[in-house]
Structures are given as C-alpha cells and as structure tokens.
C-alpha cells in the first residue's frame, strides 16, 4: 500500500482478514439460523426428516445463490461508478 511501512501494511492486512472472517461468520450464522428456523420443526428425533433435509438444502442453495448474485451486482455497480468517475 502506498505511504505505509511494511509493518503498517502487515497490520492493515491482518485487520482486514479479521474483519472478513467476522463478516463471513455473521453471514454463516444468519444462514444457519434462517434455514433452521424455516425448515426444522420436528424435535422428536435426533435426525432430520427427509423433508427437513431437503428444505435445508434448498434454503442453503438459494441463500448462497443470492449472496453470489448480490456480490456480482455490487461488482457491476462499482465498475460502472468507477468508469463514470474516470470519465469526469
């Protein structure tokens, strides 16, 4: 990074990595909570029923697809904004 010493750059990288891990854990925790709440309703057995298992699979797939598409869309918007700013 410009203007940073090697030590400052390493510290910044470590902080960014920690932040990314925290954000990932938050997204993962929300995914687990949302899919569990939406899909699991029978607590009479240790194992998931076939319906619950299928529901969780669909929920996770849908959530991951949504996150992927959101990331792509934000990237597209960021690229468009960057291009617009460079034209000025």
From Swiss-Prot:
Keywords in alphabetical order: Chaperone, Disulfide bond, Membrane, Metal-binding, Mitochondrion, Mitochondrion inner membrane, Protein transport, Translocation, Transport, Zinc
Gene Ontology biological-process annotations: protein transport
Subcellular location: Mitochondrion inner membrane
Membrane topology term: Peripheral membrane protein
One MF term in the entry's GO annotations: metal ion binding
GO (cellular component) term, any one: mitochondrial inner membrane
SUPFAM superfamilies linked to this entry: Tim10-like (SSF144122)
UniProt-listed InterPro entries: Mito_inner_translocase_sub (IPR050673), Tim10-like (IPR004217), Tim10-like_dom_sf (IPR035427)
Twin CX3C motif (motif): residue ranges: 35-59
Disulfide bond residue pairs: 35-59, 39-55
Subunit structure: Heterohexamer; composed of 3 copies of tim9 and 3 copies of tim10, named soluble 70 kDa complex. Associates with the tim22 complex, whose core is composed of tim22 and tim54. Interacts with the transmembrane regions of multi-pass transmembrane proteins in transit.
PANTHER family in the record: MITOCHONDRIAL IMPORT INNER MEMBRANE TRANSLOCASE SUBUNIT TIM9B (PTHR13172)
Record text about domains: The twin CX3C motif contains 4 conserved Cys residues that form 2 disulfide bonds in the mitochondrial intermembrane space. However, during the transit of tim9 from cytoplasm into mitochondrion, the Cys residues probably coordinate zinc, thereby preventing folding and allowing its transfer across mitochondrial outer membrane.
Family per record: Belongs to the small Tim family.
Role played: Mitochondrial intermembrane chaperone that participates in the import and insertion of multi-pass transmembrane proteins into the mitochondrial inner membrane. Also required for the transfer of beta-barrel precursors from the TOM complex to the sorting and assembly machinery (SAM complex) of the outer membrane. Acts as a chaperone-like protein that protects the hydrophobic precursors from aggregation and guide them through the mitochondrial intermembrane space.
Designated name of the protein: Mitochondrial import inner membrane translocase subunit tim9
Organism of this sequence: Neurospora crassa (strain ATCC 24698 / 74-OR23-1A / CBS 708.71 / DSM 1257 / FGSC 987)
Gene name per UniProt: tim9
